[in-house]
């Protein structure tokens, strides 16, 4: 499962205005912080990626949505404050799991690491 590859690291895209708190709706986010999680559970900011808001003035742009999903296609997870069903479906089609969570980024990443370890555990 996932996009981890041989080294087992993976990426998490976080929608945030300040780099501290998960506080952006997927469709309104103009920037994602890309966090790399190593196989030992440590994580760090890899980069930021600028996106075009797919939802502006009550209108949705499928073109912007598809571009944003493609831009995040190397990520295993996306953390946002909210996400609509269409965006979640588009991410899922690319193998990306979205979580709607409003919390500090560090705390949210720690929860995703626990989740990731549980679903990828081999007995």
Show which residues each predicted segment covers.
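Non-catalytic interface/targeting segments
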Residues: 1-67, 74, 101-123
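Mid-chain, well-packed structural core segment of small domains
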Residues: 61-97
């Amino acid at each position: 499962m996932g996009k981890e590859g041989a080294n087992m690291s993976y990426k998490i895209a976080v929608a945030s205005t300040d780099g501290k708190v998960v506080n952006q709706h997927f469709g309104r986010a103009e920037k994602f912080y890309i966090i790399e999680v190593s196989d030992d559970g440590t994580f760090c900011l890899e980069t930021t990626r600028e996106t075009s808001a797919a939802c502006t003035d009550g209108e949705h742009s499928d073109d912007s949505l598809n571009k944003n999903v493609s831009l995040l296609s190397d990520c295993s997870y996306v953390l946002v404050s909210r996400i609509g069903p269409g965006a979640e479906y588009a991410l899922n089609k690319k193998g990306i799991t979205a979580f709607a969570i409003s919390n500090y980024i560090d705390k949210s990443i720690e929860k995703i690491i626990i989740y990731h370890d549980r679903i990828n555990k081999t007995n």
